[in-house]
């Protein structure tokens, strides 16, 4: 007769996650998004929201590759938000958090510029996850 395996119920502390590996270039994102100098401040205002979300992802059970995909999609989301500022000048008056909340919803995000169907699906997945994170 085979011996029964008993699973341990001991909770072991998890090692601290070094989130800087996921955002090593985050401070450069606003410059990469900007078309004109006016684009940099709203881009910089998005970064604290992105950092908190990346910290949340890093503390989850997601694999590093999945987290990196979400981080890449955040970069795309920031670029799409800044692009929208050029089409609707009234958006420049809104705080970054509101721009971010308007850009993501329970179904995903807006259509990404020149993105494939696979890229759009991945982007929408990140936007849905970010939407749930931002919900009170």
Give a label for each model feature.
Residues 1-136:
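Charge-rich, intrinsically disordered N-terminal extensions
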């Amino acid at each position: 007769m085979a011996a029964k395996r008993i699973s341990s119920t001991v909770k072991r502390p998890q090692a601290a996650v070094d989130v800087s590996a996921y955002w090593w270039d985050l401070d450069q994102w606003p410059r990469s998004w900007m078309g004109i100098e006016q684009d940099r401040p709203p881009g910089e205002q998005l970064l604290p929201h992105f950092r908190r979300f990346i910290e949340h992802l890093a503390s989850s059970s997601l694999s590093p590759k999945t987290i990196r995909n979400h981080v890449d999609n955040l970069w795309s989301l920031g670029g799409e938000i800044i692009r929208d500022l050029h089409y609707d000048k009234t958006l420049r008056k809104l705080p970054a958090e509101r721009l971010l909340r308007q850009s993501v919803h329970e179904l995903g995000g807006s259509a990404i510029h020149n993105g494939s169907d696979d890229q759009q699906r991945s982007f929408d997945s990140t936007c849905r996850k970010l939407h749930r994170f931002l919900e009170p």
